[in-house]
């Protein structure tokens, strides 16, 4: 019925096809610095676009509620085995459709409404699923938050004191806008001292952790959640890693607890990405991600910008824009006009509203994927500073855009 030559997107839906082509061109032409974005390989995209999207497979490998699952069982088991090998985990669930749903799965497995949880404050670098008031985690649970000290590192002493006082049932580590290394072992000891579960959301750092360039939380945590995109460079989705003793509870929480049939085409993409992440080339890539981030931060500092925490020890950094008298919202827009894509982001104790902000968040994974190294990272840092020095000079923006175009032309994403 479906002849491949006749049922192509451009023939069936020219509007969607045009938008896809335009987005492809945008990705090729713009320098991508959003820390949570990356470029997947053609192999990952091919898996996601396969016939596996047709298959319903409620349950788990070998224990399905539908027939005809023998081949999707192979795919899901490969994903499980590979992600366990990648991070040294005892057990894994690869079915969560997102990082947020992975977190929700852990909460559903071990918490009851009204229990106390403790996570990093969203205002100081945490994630909204760690207890933000408007999120399910903030509505269903009693939330206490820890934050940063005067040096803009995690205040571990205050964290321990708060945990001893409030006795949360679950302590959450991980962040969406924190540049330094997190001491997972220390937080784990705090959790153990009060009998709390310890969960790490490593979504931002997963690729670095897989390559050994950022501390691995898996030996220290009861549960580790992650997205499979971002620095891991896979499809958009989630994963839960856990101690073997928690596997049954987590599996039940995901299905039938909060999800029905898994997205087998996405799980196939995850399996492919995990195989890619097990290669020496992926380790070299992540080493370059960290090098590029360091050079980018150093360049911005040399140009008079303040980096929150003073440096980066990972792939991500927050830039304080107050000295330039420009908001994060405005900087995001103007840098976008120069074909440099960033996102506005609150800085610690930000006086601006969340939709305005006093900062921008930058990350190095995507530009490193397209081949940028230290020289290019330095150029990018100077281009950003050039824009922020004269944000309302049209000629300046045009000049930066031309220089950005020269860079992206030299380093195509999909070539």
Swiss-Prot record:
GO terms under biological process: glycine biosynthetic process from serine; tetrahydrofolate interconversion
Localization per record: Cytoplasm
Pathway assigned to this chain's UniProt record: One-carbon metabolism; tetrahydrofolate interconversion; Amino-acid biosynthesis; glycine biosynthesis; glycine from L-serine: step 1/1
Record's keyword terms, sorted: Amino-acid biosynthesis, Cytoplasm, One-carbon metabolism, Pyridoxal phosphate, Transferase
SUPFAM superfamilies hit by this protein: PLP-dependent transferases (SSF53383)
Modified residue annotations for N6-(pyridoxal phosphate)lysine: 230
GO MF annotation terms: glycine hydroxymethyltransferase activity; pyridoxal phosphate binding
Cofactor(s) this protein cannot do without: pyridoxal 5'-phosphate
Binding site for (6S)-5,6,7,8-tetrahydrofolate: 122, 126-128
Gene3D superfamilies per UniProt: Aspartate Aminotransferase, domain 1, Type I PLP-dependent aspartate aminotransferase-like (Major domain)
Nuclease among keywords: no
Site for Plays an important role in substrate specificity, residues: 229
Family annotation (Pfam families): SHMT
InterPro entries according to UniProt: PyrdxlP-dep_Trfase, PyrdxlP-dep_Trfase_major, PyrdxlP-dep_Trfase_small, Ser_HO-MeTrfase, Ser_HO-MeTrfase-like, Ser_HO-MeTrfase_PLP_BS, SHMT-like_dom
Gene Ontology cellular component list: cytosol
EC numbers: 2.1.2.1
Catalysed reactions, as listed in the record: (6R)-5,10-methylene-5,6,7,8-tetrahydrofolate + glycine + H2O = (6S)-5,6,7,8-tetrahydrofolate + L-serine
Function, as annotated: Catalyzes the reversible interconversion of serine and glycine with tetrahydrofolate (THF) serving as the one-carbon carrier. This reaction serves as the major source of one-carbon groups required for the biosynthesis of purines, thymidylate, methionine, and other important biomolecules. Also exhibits THF-independent aldolase activity toward beta-hydroxyamino acids, producing glycine and aldehydes, via a retro-aldol mechanism.
Subunit note: Homodimer.
Family from the record: Belongs to the SHMT family.
Protein name as it appears in the record: Serine hydroxymethyltransferase
Organism: Cupriavidus necator (strain ATCC 17699 / DSM 428 / KCTC 22496 / NCIMB 10442 / H16 / Stanier 337)
Biological classification of the source: Bacteria, Pseudomonadati, Pseudomonadota, Betaproteobacteria, Burkholderiales
Gene name for this UniProt entry: glyA
């Amino acid at each position: 019925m479906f002849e491949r030559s006749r049922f192509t997107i451009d023939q069936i839906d020219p509007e969607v096809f045009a938008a896809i082509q335009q987005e492809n061109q945008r990705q090729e032409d713009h320098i991508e610095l959003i820390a949570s974005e990356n470029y997947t390989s053609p192999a990952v995209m091919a898996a996601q676009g396969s016939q596996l999207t047709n298959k319903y497979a409620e349950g788990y490998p070998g224990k399905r509620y539908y027939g005809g699952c023998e081949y999707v069982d192979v795919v899901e088991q490969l994903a499980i085995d590979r992600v366990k090998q990648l991070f040294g985990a005892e057990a894994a669930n690869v079915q969560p459709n997102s990082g947020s749903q992975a977190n929700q799965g852990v909460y559903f497995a071990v918490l009851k409404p009204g229990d106390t949880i403790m996570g990093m404050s969203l205002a100081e670098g945490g994630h909204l699923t760690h207890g933000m008031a408007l999120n399910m985690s903030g509505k269903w649970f009693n939330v206490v938050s820890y934050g940063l000290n005067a040096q803009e590192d995690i205040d571990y002493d205050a964290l321990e004191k708060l945990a001893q006082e409030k006795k949360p049932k679950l302590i959450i580590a991980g962040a969406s806008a924190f540049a330094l290394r997190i001491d997972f072992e220390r937080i784990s000891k705090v959790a153990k001292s009060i009998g709390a579960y310890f969960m790490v959301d490593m979504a931002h750092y997963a690729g670095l952790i897989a390559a050994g360039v950022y501390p691995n939380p898996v030996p220290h945590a009861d549960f580790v959640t992650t997205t499979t995109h971002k620095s891991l460079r896979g499809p958009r989705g989630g994963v839960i890693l856990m101690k073997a003793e928690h596997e049954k509870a987590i599996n039940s929480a995901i299905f039938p607890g909060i999800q029905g049939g898994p997205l087998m085409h996405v799980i196939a993409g995850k399996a492919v990405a995990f195989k890619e992440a097990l290669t020496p080339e992926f380790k070299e890539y992540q080493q370059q991600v960290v090098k590029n981030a360091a050079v980018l931060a150093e360049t911005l500092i040399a140009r008079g910008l303040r980096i929150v925490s003073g440096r980066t020890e990972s792939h991500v950094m927050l830039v304080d824009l107050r000295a330039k008298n420009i908001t994060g919202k405005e900087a995001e827009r103007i840098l976008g006009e120069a074909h440099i894509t960033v996102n506005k982001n609150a800085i610690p104790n930000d006086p601006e509203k969340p939709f305005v902000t006093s900062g921008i968040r930058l990350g190095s994974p995507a530009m490193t994927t397209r081949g940028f190294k230290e020289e290019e990272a330095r150029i990018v840092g100077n281009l950003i500073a050039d824009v922020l020095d004269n944000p309302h000079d049209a000629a300046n923006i045009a000049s930066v855009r031309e220089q950005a175009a020269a860079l992206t032309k030299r380093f195509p994403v999909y070539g």
